[in-house]
């Protein structure tokens, strides 16, 4: 399915077993959106007041996704220069690339990934964030921040290499960090 125009409705349900491509001029808008697809490439806007976007495979976003809930279970989530905003964000992937991107949750940000590349990116939660990263977390010039609770761990495997060169990892509440190695000349509070 390829969208280069406007798809809009009060209640919109899009279920597609293949890949959905929403190009730069594409807009998908709804008061309530239920989007379920095998793969998603978004360069435009996917906007909804409520609802869920679920991808089973790869998600590539260079545009804006703003929904109530985002769930992705693919091999890769590439949000380079993209914006993802939701109440809850649940990312299950082998590789999360958020270079110069923004992923923001107003409630819960959950990331379970082998590698997270957040160089010059922002991973933010107004409430809490849990990052389970097994191999590498690269936060050079990036920001990982919450207002309440932040947990970064490698599922107790003692394999995580965390690079926070000129980056910021902070929480106004509690911070829990467990890694095999930490390279930090940034801010960790």
Predicted regions and their residues:
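Short, T/G/N/S-enriched strand-turn elements that build extracellular solenoid repeat scaffolds
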Residues: 1-8, 20-28, 40-47, 59-66, ...
């Amino acid at each position: 399915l390829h969208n280069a125009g406007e798809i809009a409705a009060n209640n919109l349900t899009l279920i597609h077993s293949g890949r959905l491509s929403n190009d730069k001029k594409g807009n998908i808008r709804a008061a309530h959106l239920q989007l379920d697809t095998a793969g998603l490439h978004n360069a435009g806007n996917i906007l909804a007041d409520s609802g869920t976007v679920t991808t089973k495979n790869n998600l590539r976003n260079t545009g804006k996704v703003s929904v109530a809930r985002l769930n992705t279970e693919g091999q890769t989530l590439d949000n380079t220069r993209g914006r993802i905003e939701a109440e809850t964000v649940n990312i299950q992937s082998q590789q999360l690339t958020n270079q110069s991107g923004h992923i923001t949750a107003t409630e819960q940000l959950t990331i379970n990934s082998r590698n997270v590349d957040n160089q010059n990116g922002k991973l933010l939660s107004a409430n809490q964030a849990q990052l389970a990263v097994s191999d590498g977390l690269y936060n050079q010039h990036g920001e990982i921040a919450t207002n309440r609770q932040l947990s970064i761990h490698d599922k107790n495997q003692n394999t995580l290499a965390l690079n926070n060169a000129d980056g910021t990892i902070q929480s106004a509440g509690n911070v829990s960090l467990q890694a095999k190695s930490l390279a930090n000349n940034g801010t960790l509070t």
